Amino acid sequence: DLGWSRGLGDVYKRQASMISNDIKRIKLAVKECAELPIGGTAVGTGINTLEGFDTLVCSFITEETDIDFSVCTNKFELLSSQNPLSNLSSQLKICAGSLNKIANDIRWLASGPMAGIGELKLPSNEPGSSIMPGKVNPTQCEAVNMVYAQILGNDLTINYAGTNGNFELNTYRPIIASSIHESITLLSEVSESFTLNALDGLKANKEKIKENLDKSLMLV
C-alpha cells in the first residue's frame, strides 16, 4: 500500500546494521565496566590499604581473565554508584529490543499461509496446528519476544538497584550482578538459537512477493 524497498536485501542490511551498531555500543559499555574501585575499601578512601595494592590486583585479574582491567579514577563514585553496570544493562536492553523488532518483522512477513502476508517462509521446526493446515508457528520469534520482556524487567531492576545505595556504599550489587548475568546469558543464547533455528532456514516466497507487488497501489 505504501512505497516498497528495493528487495529483501535492503531489509536484511538494515537489520544487520542495527545489531552491528548495538554490539559496538555494548563493547564500549563493557570497557567502562573494566574500571575497578579496588583498594578503595569501604567508602573509597583506601584507608589501611597498602600503596599499589589496587594496580597489583588489577594486573592479576587482567592476567587471569585476559580482560584489560584498570583502576578507576574516582573510587568514591564507583563504590557508591553502579552507573557503568546500569549503562551496560541499558545497552543489552537496546540490543534485545532490536532483535525483538527483527523477530516481529519476520513473524509478520511469514504470517499465513492464506490470510497473512506470507512473503517469508519460516523453517518448520515442530508440527504446526492440526486444525490449521500449512500454519508454521513462529516459536523462535516468540522466544525472542519473551527474552526481551525478561531483559526489560532486569534492566529496570538494575537501574533501581543502582540508585538505592545509601551514601558512600551501594549494597545492591548482588541483585545487579544476578540480573545482568541473566540478561547476558539470555541474549547470548536466544541470539544463537534464533540464528540456527530461524534465520539460517528463512526463505523468500518469491511467488507471494510478486503477487503483492503486482497488486500494489504504487503502480498506479
Show the residue positions of the predicted features.
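Catalytic-core signal marking the mid-to-C-terminal active-site face
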Residues: 22, 77, 81, 85, ...
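Single conserved hydrophobic/aromatic residue that forms the stacking wall/gate
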Residues: 1-8, 12
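Glycine-rich phosphate/diphosphate-binding loop of Rossmann-like nucleotide-binding domains
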Residues: 24-37
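Short acidic-hydrophobic sequence patches enriched in Asp/Glu that either
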Residues: 18, 49-57, 136-143
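Amphipathic alpha-helical coiled-coil segments
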Residues: 19, 26, 85-88, 92-95, ...
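Structural preference for solvent-exposed beta-strand-turn elements
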Residues: 10, 14-17, 24
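Glycine-rich tight-turn/loop motif centered on a GG-T
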Residues: 9, 46-47, 133
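Acidic, glycine-rich loop-and-beta core segments that form the ion-binding/anion-interacting portion
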Residues: 43-125
